[in-house]
Structure formats: structure tokens, C-alpha cells
């Protein structure tokens, strides 16, 4: 779909890298990796610079922890005039109640809660799209 993908790793030297199966898919898609120690990715200069370079108004966000890094990044993106879409089944926390609180706070601050299928069909727009058959077979049964 030719969407820019940025993924951040929170202090990988201490916490470890992104899990191997996901990391390999991100590498295969030529995603931009940014290591950070800040909880909000927006407090990382490399992240801010890259966001300026790609110049996108709408941001789809996934990750962990919903109530820490995802929350702080979402709020900062919203405060910087971005439209943020949080993918419900792609965010989480160690405790369910923390994830729920994080999601609720993101929504109260102006983020939109969406799911993976919503993203897919909104981006594809038409069953004739070249990506529809290839990608829809992975989750539409």
C-alpha cells in the first residue's frame, strides 16, 4: 500500500528488541526503526524529524503499553495537529484495565478507535484494487 511505517523500540538494550517474527516483517517492508528511551515517541528527535519528512496528517498507531508509550505518543501527535487512529486489537498492556484506561484517555483527547478491517477497507476502497485479493484472503473468510 506504500504507506510509511515507523516502528519504535523502547530501550532495546535493556528491554530487548521487537519480537523476531514481527521484526522480520517490518524489515521486509523497509520500515523505519527508531530506538528510544522517551515514553512518547514524539519526544525523540529522530522520530520528530522523520514525521516532518513524511508529512502525513493521519497516523495509524499500534503498540504497547497502551497506557504509557502509546498514550503519550498519541496525545503528543494530537497536540501537533495529527489525526490519530488507534487500532484496538493492536494495542495492549500487561494488565487489561491499564489498556482500557489508556484507550479511554486517548479517545477523550481526540483519537479515533478503529479496528484492522476498518483500516484495510478504507485504504483499499474498491474490490478492484490490486491489493484487495492478496490481502483480504488473509483475514476475510
Question: Where on the chain are the PLM-derived regions?
Answer:
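A short, N-terminal amphipathic alpha-helix
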Residues: 1-4
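Alpha-helical substrate-recognition element adjacent to the catalytic core
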Residues: 7
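Active-site anion-handling motifs in enzyme catalytic cores
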Residues: 10
